[in-house]
Amino acid sequence: MSCQGPVCTNLGLKPGQRLTVKGIIAPNAKSFVMNLGKDSTHLGLHFNPRFDAHGDVNLIVCNSKKMEEWGTEQRETVFPFQKGAPIEITFSINPSDLTVHLPGHQFSFPNRLGLSVFDYFDTHGDFTLRSVSWE
């Protein structure tokens, strides 16, 4: 079962700041999505852990989107997620990229859109949001 999650706007996240998301992955999860960007049409990071979706199994797919144009996918094979389990994910904003901090693993994704401020966050899919914090 998938549903639209909350949308946060006017976050004002700049290099040196980070966004931490906590929640519970659904017991029957196929995938979930977290987006960070300027707005819903300018996504600096589309973060999509896939348990079994779009032909991918236990894979994290990241991308960027400007208007309706998607960039090239970046795929991460380290998959620290478990169905039905709590998770904490932190996104650190850097001048030229974002660092995604996961349990026992981290990776970077380039700031392809050259955003100086990340104002937008949304999440949807097989994930129940418990908290969002930024500093």
Swiss-Prot record:
Keywords: Acetylation, Disulfide bond, Lectin. Gene3D superfamilies: 2.60.120.200. A beta-D-galactoside binds at H46, F47, N48, P49, R50, H54, N63, W70, G71, T72, E73, Q74, R75, E76. The gene is CG-1B. The keyword Acetylation applies. Homodimer; disulfide-linked. (Microbial infection) Interacts with newcastle disease virus protein HN; this interaction inhibits viral adsorption rather than internalization. The modification N-acetylserine is found at S2. This is Beta-galactoside-binding lectin. It comes from the Eukaryota. Residues 5-135 form the Galectin domain. One of its GO terms (molecular function) is laminin binding. Disulfide bonds join C3-C8. This protein binds beta-galactoside. May participate in host antiviral defense through specific interaction with glycans on the viral envelope glycoproteins. The keyword NAD does not apply. GO terms for cellular component: extracellular space. Mainly in the intestine (adult), mainly in the skin (embryo).
